[in-house]
């Protein structure tokens, strides 16, 4: 949880996340308004000591707390998807290409394990291995989801969710997958890298 907050804080400070956000004017007070330019959920100033005081949410003595779980937040995200011919007809220059995708189901009892078989299926489908993909966005429903994926897949923390994730940015229902895709697209554009993998639970795309 701490790393996610720190990474989101850095992404905000450098303007990386701002480049993905369309500012909107929202009501404030009885007659006023304000321009929202940044996500409100990140807490980059939080400390490990503060996180350690948070109580388990599912069972006594458990390890899942509000500090290592995603926040259910309001949000919206938008991308335009089309084939090359349609984009060319409209004079739209694509910024990324969906190479492939997989959908893999797991038992609801282990729903947090979904990214692992889904990513493996994608690797197998494309004849790829972990190191062939430059960057991974894996939804931080809970921190343990990412820890499990890193361990089982052998992918480094330095190539996964480096701008924060669901724990720090939030997990708006219906928008998270697109938000992650936009972040991955910006990462590829700014880094000059080629492939990113987005894993939202059991559906992955490259």
Each language-model region and where it sits:
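Generic structural signal for well-ordered, non-membrane alpha-helical segments
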Residues: 1-5, 17, 43-47, 69-73, ...
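Condensing-enzyme catalytic core mediating Claisen C-C bond formation in acyl metabolism
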Residues: 46-113, 117, 124-125, 182-183, ...
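Internal helix-turn-beta structural module
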Residues: 130, 151-152, 156-161, 166-205
């Amino acid at each position: 949880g701490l790393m996610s907050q720190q990474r989101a804080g850095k992404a905000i400070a450098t303007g990386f996340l701002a480049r993905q956000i369309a500012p909107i004017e929202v009501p404030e007070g009885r007659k006023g308004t304000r321009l929202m330019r940044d996500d409100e959920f990140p807490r980059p100033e939080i400390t490990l000591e503060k996180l350690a005081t948070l109580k388990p949410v599912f069972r006594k003595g458990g390890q899942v707390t509000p500090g290592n779980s995603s926040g259910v937040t309001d949000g919206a995200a938008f991308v335009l998807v089309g084939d090359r011919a349609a984009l060319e007809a409209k004079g739209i220059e694509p910024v990324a290409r969906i190479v492939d995708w997989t959908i893999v189901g797991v038992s609801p009892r282990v729903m947090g394990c979904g990214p692992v078989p889904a990513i493996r299926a994608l690797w197998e489908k494309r004849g790829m291995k972990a190191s062939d993909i430059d960057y991974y966005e894996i939804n931080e429903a809970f921190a343990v989801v990412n820890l499990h994926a890193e361990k089982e897949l052998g992918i480094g923390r330095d190539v996964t969710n480096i701008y924060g994730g669901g724990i720090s940015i939030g997990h708006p229902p219906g928008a998270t997958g697109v938000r992650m895709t936009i972040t991955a697209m910006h990462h590829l554009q700014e880094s000059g890298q080629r492939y990113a993998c987005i894993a939202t639970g059991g559906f992955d795309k490259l």
